[in-house]
Curated annotation (Swiss-Prot):
Pfam families noted in UniProt: Histone
Organism domain of life: Eukaryota
Subunit description: The nucleosome is a histone octamer containing two molecules each of H2A, H2B, H3 and H4 assembled in one H3-H4 heterotetramer and two H2A-H2B heterodimers. The octamer wraps approximately 147 bp of DNA.
Glycosylated residues in this chain: S110
Keyword DNA-binding: yes
SUPFAM superfamilies named in the record: Histone-fold
Name of the featured protein: Histone H2B
Gene: His2B
Keywords attached to this entry: Chromosome, DNA-binding, Glycoprotein, Isopeptide bond, Methylation, Nucleosome core, Nucleus, Ubl conjugation
GO cellular component: nucleosome; nucleus
Ranges where the record places region Disordered: 1-30
UniProt subcellular location: Nucleus; Chromosome
Lineage of origin: Eukaryota, Metazoa, Ecdysozoa, Arthropoda, Hexapoda
Amino acid sequence: MPPKTSGKAAKKAGKAQKNITKTDKKKKRKRKESYAIYIYKVLKQVHPDTGISSKAMSIMNSFVNDIFERIAAEASRLAHYNKRSTITSREIQTAVRLLLPGELAKHAVSEGTKAVTKYTSSK
């Protein structure tokens, strides 16, 4: 068994062994994609005086990812059934109607239609 060294001594030994030159670049930290800023913006529109914990934000982010994945999978299935190679807004709309219950689906479809109309008119 090798002899134990103190934490500081081991760190110093590790640093001395590596030659750092100006050409060496720092590793870039990989960005973690999240819907957190958008969830926060919607929260502030609905309840301006309410905050959200990081745990709740993580849960909301997982929820949004899950719903998007379900919609995408259902839209893909619909396109495949109809022998189409492109997922259009029609497939997305049908997928939403199939996945979401009753009134929630109606609201989602109307908001989606409104967003698509706004996007196409801005072009």
